Amino acid sequence: MTTFHVLGFPRVGAKRELKFAQERYWRKELAEQDLLDLAKALREKNWKHQADANADFVAVGDFTFYDHILDLQVATGAIPARFGFDSKNLTLDQYFQLARGNKDQFAIEMTKWFDTNYHYLVPEFHKDTQFKANPTHYVNQIREAKVAGHQVKPVIVGPLTFLWLGKEKGESFNRFELLAQLVPVYVEILNALVAEGAEWIQIDEPALAVDLPKEWGNAYKDVYATLSEKVNAKLLLATYFGSVTEHATLLKELSVDGLHLDLVRAPEQLVAFEDYNKVLSAGVIDGRNIWRANLNTVLDVLEPLKEKLGERLWIAPSCSLLHTPFDLNVETQLQENNPALYSWLAFTLQKVQELSVLKTALEKGRTAVNVELDASQVAADARANSKEIHRPEVAERLANLPKNADQRKSPFGERIKLQNAWLNLPLLPTTSIGSFPQTTDIRRARAAFKKGDLSLEEYENSMKKEIELVVREQEKLDLDVLVHGEPERNDMVEYFGELLDGFAFTKFGWVQSYGSRCVKPPVIYGDVVRPKAMTVRWSKYAQSLTKKVMKGMLTGPVTILQWSFVRNDIPRSTVCKQIGVALSDEVLDLEKAGIKVIQIDEPAIREGLPLKRADWDTYLQWAGEAFRLSSMGVADDTQIHTHMCYSEFNDILPAIAALDADVITIETSRSDMELLTAFGDFKYPNDIGPGVYDIHSPRVPTAEEIEHLLRKALNVVPKERLWVNPDCGLKTRGWSETIAQLEVMMSVTKKLRAELA
């Protein structure tokens, strides 16, 4: 036989049932027991889906009310002491307070789960952190699954990855020092799972796919020797998100009973493990993307493995399926509008079925599933030959770009003189990042237009009214470079995706970002082309309302790529450059329309960095090229801005400088301008606008706070190159606090201008 299992399942439900229940509970509209009952029903459905597909185990312990790393903090007694909670007697309300904060304590920090778009809650480790086992979360889920008659495989993140994902707080120390006292707590937790009947336990160690310091890598041997010796269960060590070839010798000698490899992200690593003499779980179905697999091609890899390994071969998705939407079958609109694309997709339930087919083929031969294999082949062939996907003119345009197409005509020093001559801006010019408050009226108008209750003319008139309001308010505030406020945009990526060829949208393709927040990424399925102007009329209309300078607003190619499900039949770098070239048509049209300050937002550029530093240069080279291509051909006196959200820039500053944007605005207020110091040390050559207040809070900053930040900025950036702006877009704020915040920003700026004049 061939064992088939999954590493984890989506938690939120087919139609985001958990999200809506959580939010009703937080608003006190749903009783705790009702939330618990709904969660139990979702878990039971998840297990049934796995069992119905003939999975040999169901994954348990992967379900969470907010985040699996928060659950692990509770299970190891490592919740932040500052909350004053007892992890053994933690209430559901207290659990949510850890994630969302309360009146006395800010929430646990959140950051990206490796290089995915999921966010986990970062463990806070102190030198005196005391771990205590509390396996209730896992034990209860095992009991539920066993009552329902399932064979269980508990899933838990391993001790080294858990420590790796945390941060040291307080007194200076290295969190690695806590490993010795964490391991016995893991032993206790795992033995509690064994006591409930767990025969196999999956321990996730994705940290093996990053650049681990030597002492961390070396620690695996002793840690797993201890776990293996003291826990009477078979241990499956799961790695994913990248290659672990560099650890092959260590992993083959590790005291575990099986190893899971991500053969989608890193198929080449299989060679290093072909002589592995224990269970090898082959992650052959993509757990991070939505494309249907060519099952014949997958079997070409698996059949020789099966011959070699026999029953020691397990099959699985590459990683947890929490990164994929739930069920393609509910996408009836997509099936109707684009049946070809629909036939190329696989969501979680379809991926589980693909694994079921592979299991049967390995056990009984391909003929036993020839109908399914033929359907898979037909879809793969149709996709490979589709004229809707492959547009020769796009490949031709990319191939025939002029030499140095991604370079501006003149260096920044010459461009800025031409720009300053016509812009005629005061010292410390002010602007905002782009969006203004998206009011209930705006959202209602958009929803009514989408439903057909509002005509195109009525909708556009309501958007024009909003734009006029935004322009007039900025004029009253005396901002220098204005924006139109983006009332017509529901989302900074979706808006452009809807207007570019090569993109499609699902109705229920939601994936969890964090807690109750879900995102519905666009699908980039074909060559990207801009059929007509996307933003020009809105910016042109806004400019017609004012004599002040109006800034055009676009989302950059790297961010569009990062926040989408991306086609997997050509390199990501090629897709990114296609988007950049398509955007360049928009930039040139804006320029022709008289919009000569254009912002190309790239909040996600750092997110795209590969897990291993050795791969950074390649990524940064093509990401930078794609960004520069998006403004190719603009005149020297057109000013290109970019905006980047809260990031550590120190290690990629040369690449940021190489983007060669005339002005970069960055989110810095929460770090007290610390991020800006790196730009100063690096001697960043172009103009900079560090955010002077945090837009994520409705709080109105004091004049003293903004002045403090601006003076710090002036210590780092020459006054001639310093812009003044909020941290980020103002979409999520209300009008009253927006005006109040900008008034303070303007009054401080004017005070400093007078002083510096």
Curated annotation (Swiss-Prot):
Protein's UniProt keywords contain Heme: no
The protein's enzyme class: transferase
GO MF, one example: zinc ion binding
Keywords (A to Z) from UniProt: Amino-acid biosynthesis, Metal-binding, Methionine biosynthesis, Methyltransferase, Repeat, Transferase, Zinc
Protein name: 5-methyltetrahydropteroyltriglutamate--homocysteine methyltransferase
Cofactor: Zn(2+)
CDD domains xrefs: CIMS_C_terminal_like, CIMS_N_terminal_like
Membrane-spanning intervals of the chain: none
Record-listed L-methionine binding positions: I433, G434, S435, E486, D601
One GO process term, biological-process aspect: methylation
Pathway: Amino-acid biosynthesis; L-methionine biosynthesis via de novo pathway; L-methionine from L-homocysteine (MetE route): step 1/1
Function as written in the Swiss-Prot or TrEMBL entry: Catalyzes the transfer of a methyl group from 5-methyltetrahydrofolate to homocysteine resulting in methionine formation.
Domain of life assignment: Bacteria
Active site, UniProt feature: H696
Disulphide-bridged cysteine pairs: none
Organism encoding this protein: Histophilus somni (strain 129Pt)
Binding site for L-homocysteine: I433, G434, S435, E486, D601
Record-stated family: Belongs to the vitamin-B12 independent methionine synthase family.
Residues binding Zn(2+): H643, C645, E667, C728
